[in-house]
Amino acid sequence: TVVKRLTDPSILSHHMYFYNRMTTSDGQYLLICQKRDEGRQLYTLNLHNGEIRQITEGDGVGQDSAMFSHDDKTIFYQQNNRFYAMDAQTLETHCFYQTPEGWSGSAPGMSSDNRFMSIVETKQDTLPPRDGSAGWNFFALTCQAKPLCRIVYIDVETGKSHVVLEDHCWFGHTQIRPNDPDTILFCHEGPY
């Protein structure tokens, strides 16, 4: 067995969330997030030759929420509470959804045909304050705070959206059931 490190250990690197499609169908490219001088950015890592290509710029890039489309032609990602579709070749992007003021969006899930995305939106003023005890402690505090969360269903082609479910409960990890875009799986977080 041969184990090969893919990233430079001096650079903080994340892979995408485990249910996100982070590799191309042919296994050539892997989506990663790295924190370098310009902050956190998304990159494609060529698994055949090790070449790393930066594909985003600016602040507020979601560190683990990007994913390839089923046909590998589009990369979906989040930046500053906006959700984008990027052409994987040209890197041309367009925003198809923006989270409303006062809310933060996260945990995207895609339909099998990449037509629909589900996300969790959390009302920011219902979250506990970040007092420096970040990390896993924040999970327990967030669960106890019972923040106002909602699951939003977005049509990627038109940008139209609607709230599917809203409650004072911490939601996470939305996934649209394969081949059934009318069923959304999600997590009620906690207790921690």
For each feature predicted by the language model, list its residue ranges.
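Blade-loop segments of beta-propeller domains
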Residues: L12-N20, D37-F83
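Conserved positions at the start
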Residues: S13, F18, G62-D64, S104-A107, ...
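Asp-box/WD-like beta-propeller blade repeats and closely related beta-sheet repeat scaffolds
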Residues: G58-R150, G159-E166
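Beta-propeller domains
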Residues: V163-Y192
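Residue position within the beta-strands of beta-propeller blades
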Residues: Q28-C33, I75-Q78, F116-V120, D182-E189
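Residue-level recognition of a conserved intra-blade site in WD40 beta-propeller repeats
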Residues: T23, F68, M110, I176-P178
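Conserved loop/turn motif of beta-propeller repeat scaffolds
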Residues: D26-G27, G39, D72, D113-N114, ...
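A short helix->beta-strand "capping" segment at the edge of beta-propeller domains
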Residues: T1-H15
